[in-house]
Amino acid sequence: MEAEPERAEAPRRGGVAAVLKMGRRARQDIFAGENLSRKNSPSASLGEVPPPKPPRRQGGWADDPVLAPTKSGRKHAEEVEDHRLRQQSLEASDDGGDIPVIPDLEDVQDEDLAMQVAAPPSVQVNRVLTYHDLDKDLMKYAAFQTLDGEVDLKLLTKVLAPEHELREDDVSWDWDHLFTEVSSELVTEWDLGQSEREDHISLP
């Protein structure tokens, strides 16, 4: 109750300069008054050491330029980032070890590709056995050696057709020519069938 009249009398005493302080300033004045009262107390005069003060952080979230929402804080953060990028770019430009060296055309020797021959590909192919190889394999077996010169192949040769009858000449096919040949063969077969039917009908 006593503090209220003192606050009311403060503007009367000091005028405009003695206006009550609000917020952080008022807390600082209160802490200063408490420190003075502790120093003047009899415990301080007896030599008792006051407890150590906890570390006090100066400033607040507004002091961080990166996290500040104001335009000035953003500009400051952008300037810091630009400064870092500029330093890196200058350091990279000073270092000449990463720059590749391009040779001149005179130093490059033209390779003669015409004289170079590519190696043939190695492909595994199953070799076909010839008759000579087959005869050698046949002679290895002792069971077939007794038949040498005694085998009669006349029955087999009677059934086999000669080579010139099996091979056909390469003839180019024409649509009109093929059509006429097929149609003529069909007509001849039809005529033969008709004549055979007439013969069967005429017989009693």
Swiss-Prot record:
Compartments where located: Cytoplasm, Cytoskeleton; Cell projection, Cilium
GO terms for biological process, alphabetical: cilium assembly; intraciliary retrograde transport
Keyword presence, Acetylation: no
Keyword Nucleotide-binding: no
Basic and acidic residues composition bias: residue spans: 1-12, 75-85
Region ranges (Disordered): 1-103
Record keywords: Cell projection, Cilium biogenesis/degradation, Cytoplasm, Cytoskeleton
Any one Gene Ontology cellular component term annotated for this protein: intraciliary transport particle A
Family membership noted in the UniProt record: Belongs to the IFT43 family.
Summary of subunit composition and partner proteins: Component of the IFT complex A (IFT-A) complex.
Function, as annotated: As a component of IFT complex A (IFT-A), a complex required for retrograde ciliary transport and entry into cilia of G protein-coupled receptors (GPCRs), it is involved in ciliogenesis. Involved in retrograde ciliary transport along microtubules from the ciliary tip to the base.
The protein's name in its UniProt record: Intraflagellar transport protein 43 homolog
Species, as recorded: Taeniopygia guttata
